[in-house]
Amino acid sequence: MPTGFQPAESFISFGQPASPPYKGNEASSSSRKGKRKASDTPAPGEKQTKKNKKDKKKKGSKKSQPVDEPDKKDGLPGLSKKQKKALKEQEHKARKSDRKRDNSRGIEAGPRNKKEEQKAAERHAPWTELVDVDLCRDPVDLLTEEINAFYKYVSPTREEFEVRLFMIELITRTINKLWPEAEVTPFGSWQTQLYLPQGDIDLVVAHKYLSDANKQRLLAELGKAMRQANITDVVAIIARARVPIIKFVTLEGKINVDISLNQANGVTAGKIINQYLDALPGARQLILIVKYFLSQRSMNEVYTGGLGSYSVICMVISFLQLHPKLRRSEINPELNLGTLLIEFFELFGRNFNYNDVGISIRRGGFYFSKASRGWMKGQSFLLSIEDPQDKDNDISGGSFGIRQVRNTLGGAYELLSMRLFERAEEMSRNARSGRRSTSWKDKEGDDWSILGGVMGITKETLKQRNELTRIHLEGRLHHKLSIPLGADPKPFVQNYRPPPIISVPSVTDHGRGASSPPPPAESSKRNKKDVGAIMVEDDELESDDDSDSDASSYSSSDSDDSDSDPVAISPRTANSRSTSRVPRADISDTESDGIIEISQPFESSGRGRKPLGDSEPSEDEIEVLSNPPEESRYAGGKGRGKAKVKDAFRPPTPPLPGQEGQLSDLSRPPTPPLPPGEEEEEIDSDEEALRRILAESDGDLGSEDEIGKEWQGAIQVDSDSDEEEKKGRKKRKRGVRSEERRAFWAAKGGNRLGQSSGDMSD
């Protein structure tokens, strides 16, 4: 099926790009601006200089013959070794410039050498064995199931987890033997449990006698201790870096290990990230996908210009925090991972404004202006991500290759979209022909996989995972640590943590909307173009009276943040009012200057609300004003999201006896209670409200003053008489409906269904 997408293989493919054609002496002469050395070969029709003749005599007849046939066919004379070398360098520069030009246009040039090309060809999608394709209703479900299957597949098994745990314990015992008072703490991907099969282990050593002056000497001692303990045979000491570390690869399992000294901020960052991950379902799956995607393209290291794990985690968290449908709790992220992954690639690969906008995940997440913080630094193309621990620190400022990363993410968006269209066409064709159950089973997973178009498992990864499993089964590390085989490692390990629990919902069991938080119920007659414009904080009414009891019951936990608690997280649930953007009052003046506001359809503050009747309210305003403060529009319930006309348009009414002084400034006066079974039902729309008012109202209503007198009298009727009580109830209901009808036409301008502004009576 022809699609509107360009072939995305040119963006992230692994095919070798064709080299540009050689332009001969034309490129050479243009690069030198018309100047040539005396030793150069003369152009056609130009006389040879004396120096060239002498050179020919010295070099003999051997050099006077043509060097190779292609040059002879092109009419070019023989070339010397020096000229050949110059031509090769020139061709290399031309290829390099073309590759740079392609990158600037959004085209990645594929593998950089034959080894990378071979690795790309060896990739396959073994996680597809965990996907039941026949139960997927559409390609989006298929992609979501693939993401969950990939997450399960790359997550560590019990054997792999314990090998890493025992390796950390072995290194810890070696360090404690060298420095008995030192404290070793793992952090990074081990702390968040977001490491890949070939991921490294980050450790920090804290000691009260460690200082910056003796760090280099202590790192050398630490490296020597690692070699003597047969943990590794080669240690690299990076002492002049901003964070001095030692790096080595373990002999058992070939695991990369980084050890730093007295860097406690890494441990704190891991604790903060774990809080975010617990509050954002689906974040772990997306983070592992993006990390693996960048890792296979050598774009996961900051020192090479790529994005580090910390930056990737913050990007995914920010994406989930600010996603409109997640802010309104309309979808379950874990059942819509396929859509979210494509939208993530689209945002940071096509639409994100890297030049002007920075990312912050603090206080619910927001975007800010880079210029307001002085983060332009002459390189506006760099990605800026605020450190959750320090708002003045840019954790992604060192990723100088972000433009190539952006092009790669954009290519992934194009390729995944194209594969979705292909699978949709194939599913539709199979459904029409009745071959659904057999068509997919006859194919290999690599053939129908959507996610396999942008990533895959290499043989090198499989080999290392098998090696870790073999080490565990043979008990090599058990023997070194004196741990019995099959025993629970908790009593024998200092930095013990339980293995991760891998549990993800399946769209084949629930469907995308079954177990998701129920979306707000919308009226069928509501203006559809307004849906989706309301943010979570739209229906939060601000109170002038700080003593309002209702205000504390629905205020966002993010808005209660103080400067002493820079990271406050409230898990987003269907019944909670966690906001994705903190109000300006909770952000300092210096911080709020650069915050980019998210456009709202109207001002939701109670202070700026216009009185009823001044202008025709919008559909959204009607809904916000109609909801009482103690009830959330997003809370589960039958009538959630419906406009209660009796609350939206009713003017203040006299309180019942005994209820004086019980009304707050923000709450509307309650109506007289009706007997059981006669409660008013919620109205879906304005037309429904008007139709009911006109249908149930009597035609003998008097003036407004008369109604008020009769109503006051009806309240004071003696309850001993049933007949008088019924009569008073009827009068009270007529008065209420008359008030409703008057307020309704006052709000609407009184010009609908033949009514005029002056014709408000019956």
Swiss-Prot record:
<comment type="function">
    <text>Required for 3' polyadenylation of the 5.8S and 25S rRNAs as a prelude to their degradation in the exosome. Involved in the nucleolar organization to ensure faithful chromosome segregation during mitosis.</text>
</comment>
<dbReference type="GO" id="GO:0005524">
    <property type="term" value="F:ATP binding"/>
</dbReference>
<feature type="domain" description="PAP-associated">
    <location>
        <begin position="336"/>
        <end position="393"/>
    </location>
</feature>
<dbReference type="InterPro" id="IPR002058">
    <property type="entry name" value="PAP_assoc"/>
</dbReference>
<feature type="binding site">
    <location>
        <position position="610"/>
    </location>
    <ligand>
        <name>ATP</name>
    </ligand>
</feature>
<keyword id="KW-0067">ATP-binding</keyword>
<dbReference type="GO" id="GO:0031123">
    <property type="term" value="P:RNA 3'-end processing"/>
</dbReference>
<feature type="compositionally biased region" description="Acidic residues">
    <location>
        <begin position="697"/>
        <end position="707"/>
    </location>
</feature>
<feature type="compositionally biased region" description="Basic and acidic residues">
    <location>
        <begin position="99"/>
        <end position="123"/>
    </location>
</feature>
<feature type="binding site">
    <location>
        <position position="309"/>
    </location>
    <ligand>
        <name>ATP</name>
    </ligand>
</feature>
<feature type="compositionally biased region" description="Polar residues">
    <location>
        <begin position="753"/>
        <end position="762"/>
    </location>
</feature>
<dbReference type="GO" id="GO:0046872">
    <property type="term" value="F:metal ion binding"/>
</dbReference>
<dbReference type="Pfam" id="PF22600">
    <property type="entry name" value="MTPAP-like_central"/>
</dbReference>
<feature type="binding site">
    <location>
        <position position="200"/>
    </location>
    <ligand>
        <name>Mg(2+)</name>
    </ligand>
</feature>
<dbReference type="GO" id="GO:0031499">
    <property type="term" value="C:TRAMP complex"/>
</dbReference>
<keyword id="KW-0460">Magnesium</keyword>
<keyword id="KW-0539">Nucleus</keyword>
<keyword id="KW-0808">Transferase</keyword>
<keyword id="KW-0479">Metal-binding</keyword>
<keyword id="KW-0547">Nucleotide-binding</keyword>
<feature type="binding site">
    <location>
        <position position="291"/>
    </location>
    <ligand>
        <name>ATP</name>
    </ligand>
</feature>
<dbReference type="GO" id="GO:1990817">
    <property type="term" value="F:poly(A) RNA polymerase activity"/>
</dbReference>
<comment type="similarity">
    <text>Belongs to the DNA polymerase type-B-like family.</text>
</comment>
<feature type="binding site">
    <location>
        <position position="266"/>
    </location>
    <ligand>
        <name>ATP</name>
    </ligand>
</feature>
<protein>
    <recommendedName>
        <fullName>Poly(A) RNA polymerase CID14</fullName>
        <ecNumber>2.7.7.19</ecNumber>
    </recommendedName>
</protein>
<feature type="compositionally biased region" description="Acidic residues">
    <location>
        <begin position="677"/>
        <end position="687"/>
    </location>
</feature>
<dbReference type="InterPro" id="IPR043519">
    <property type="entry name" value="NT_sf"/>
</dbReference>
<feature type="compositionally biased region" description="Basic residues">
    <location>
        <begin position="50"/>
        <end position="62"/>
    </location>
</feature>
<feature type="binding site">
    <location>
        <position position="202"/>
    </location>
    <ligand>
        <name>Mg(2+)</name>
    </ligand>
</feature>
<feature type="binding site">
    <location>
        <position position="189"/>
    </location>
    <ligand>
        <name>ATP</name>
    </ligand>
</feature>
<dbReference type="InterPro" id="IPR045862">
    <property type="entry name" value="Trf4-like"/>
</dbReference>
<feature type="binding site">
    <location>
        <position position="310"/>
    </location>
    <ligand>
        <name>ATP</name>
    </ligand>
</feature>
<feature type="region of interest" description="Disordered">
    <location>
        <begin position="1"/>
        <end position="123"/>
    </location>
</feature>
<feature type="region of interest" description="Disordered">
    <location>
        <begin position="482"/>
        <end position="762"/>
    </location>
</feature>
<feature type="compositionally biased region" description="Basic and acidic residues">
    <location>
        <begin position="65"/>
        <end position="75"/>
    </location>
</feature>
<dbReference type="GO" id="GO:0005730">
    <property type="term" value="C:nucleolus"/>
</dbReference>
<dbReference type="InterPro" id="IPR054708">
    <property type="entry name" value="MTPAP-like_central"/>
</dbReference>
<dbReference type="Pfam" id="PF03828">
    <property type="entry name" value="PAP_assoc"/>
</dbReference>
<feature type="compositionally biased region" description="Acidic residues">
    <location>
        <begin position="536"/>
        <end position="549"/>
    </location>
</feature>
<dbReference type="GO" id="GO:0043634">
    <property type="term" value="P:polyadenylation-dependent ncRNA catabolic process"/>
</dbReference>
<comment type="subunit">
    <text>Component of the TRAMP complex.</text>
</comment>
<feature type="compositionally biased region" description="Polar residues">
    <location>
        <begin position="572"/>
        <end position="581"/>
    </location>
</feature>
